[in-house]
A protein has these predicted regions:
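Catalytic core of nucleotide-activated saccharide and alditol-phosphate transferases
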Residues: 1-134
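Catalytic binding pocket for nucleotide-activated donors in carbohydrate/polymer assembly enzymes
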Residues: 6-8, 12-14, 29-37, 41-42, ...
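Alpha-helical packing segments of well-folded alpha/beta enzyme cores
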Residues: 27, 158-162, 201
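A Trp-anchored, charged/polar loop motif used as the substrate-binding/catalytic surface
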Residues: 49-59, 156-157, 191-196
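Conserved hydrophobic/aromatic pocket- or pore-lining residues that grip, position, or stack substrates
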Residues: 68, 166, 227
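Short, flexible/disordered intra-domain loops and linkers
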Residues: 80-87, 147-152, 188-189
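Residues that form generic nucleotide/phosphate-binding pockets
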Residues: 94, 165, 169, 245
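Alpha-helix-centered segments that form part of catalytic cores
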Residues: 122-169, 175
Length: 257
């Protein structure tokens, strides 16, 4: 990224020397025509043998045992949307409204469809160091705003809201370096080491919770594969590709509202 906040991703995508693999089917459908024969759809996976070997090395640690757990960021500390400066009441109200509506819908991300030219222009004026992608036919301003800015904000709002609701009713444990002071009652045990501690959390938690980032439109995030590879039980938000690979109610459970 240059000092002007511009990146030329189109040349990287269309370069005949590059091969790109995407785990999100909808993203693949958008990008594949830009470089036929060089862009592929490939779901993620996990190294089950490695995960099981990490679990086998377990030395009992009560910090890594939980009834209901979530591992990951709340996105509160890295949300570019929060840099929005002095938006008008109408812009703020419109953005708050569409984000609130999206929070209630799983399996379909409609924010980009609701960003008019006027809203896009107003947003750009209020966003310092706006991330513009040079000469990109598919990453338009509306796509950037909906995915990079608003998508991250919705993910943050969703995670904080769900953690608040769950911690009021159940012993909720979170493994994160995010600030959880706004969530009373939650048990924040800090971050975990990806290769040594995280497999134990997934294996020994009674219920593992997955909340997919809104930037992943249809694909299955790595977190789901890792939890299942550790022999853990997972409840996830609904993603369109989940039923293509798993039997809901047998391999995995999902929530939709």
């Amino acid at each position: 990224r240059s000092g002007h906040g511009r990146m030329n991703v189109t040349s990287a995508i269309t370069n005949s020397c590059n091969y790109i693999f995407l785990f999100d089917q909808l993203q693949y459908q958008d990008i594949a025509p830009l470089n036929p024969g060089h862009i592929f759809y490939l779901p993620l996976a996990t190294d089950v043998a490695f995960m099981q070997s990490a679990i086998a090395k377990d030395v009992f640690d009560s910090r890594l045992r939980a009834d209901l757990s979530f591992v990951g960021s709340l996105y509160t500390e890295k949300c570019p949307y929060d840099k929005l400066q002095s938006p008008s009441d109408s812009l703020r109200g419109y953005l708050d409204g569409i984000m609130e509506a999206q929070l209630k819908v799983y399996g379909y991300y409609f924010i980009e469809d609701l960003l008019t030219d006027d809203i896009v222009a107003d947003f750009k004026r209020c966003m310092p160091d706006y991330l513009a992608l040079k000469d990109s036919p598919f990453l338009t301003d509306s796509a950037i705003i909906s995915k990079y800015y608003i998508g991250n904000k919705i993910s943050s709002l969703e995670r904080v809201s769900l953690m608040k609701q769950l911690s009021k009713r159940f012993p909720m444990t979170i493994y994160t370096n995010s600030d959880t002071s706004c969530i009373p009652g939650i048990d924040n045990r800090g971050g975990v080491m990806t290769r040594t501690e995280m497999p134990l959390v997934f294996h020994y938690s009674t219920i593992n919770l997955n909340m997919t980032s809104k930037g992943i439109r249809s694909g299955i995030p790595l977190r789901i594969w890792d939890i299942l590879g550790c022999g853990g039980f997972v409840i996830s938000n609904y993603q369109p590709e989940i039923p293509e690979y798993f039997s809901i109610g047998e391999d995995i459970e999902v929530y939709e509202s």
